[in-house]
Amino acid sequence: MNYTDLKDKNLNELQVLLKEKKVLLFELKAKLKTMQLTNTSELRATKKDIAKIQTALTAVKAN
């Protein structure tokens, strides 16, 4: 996910996307705790996606 993809979205789309990513992060953390997660780099990528979405949300709210 690139920031350039996110800056074209409106506020509602970004909020929905943020909620989906947070749910995914929760599921990944649960899988990690139960030793079901084999690719731990997914956690890092999901956290970075959440940060990008939050940055885009801040930019949209500022305008």
From Swiss-Prot:
Keywords: Ribonucleoprotein, Ribosomal protein. GO terms for biological process: translation. GO terms for molecular function: structural constituent of ribosome. GO terms for cellular component: ribonucleoprotein complex; ribosome. It holds the Pfam family Ribosomal_L29. Signal peptide: none annotated. It comes from the Bacteria. Belongs to the universal ribosomal protein uL29 family. NCBIfam families: L29 (TIGR00012). HAMAP family: Ribosomal_uL29. This is Large ribosomal subunit protein uL29.
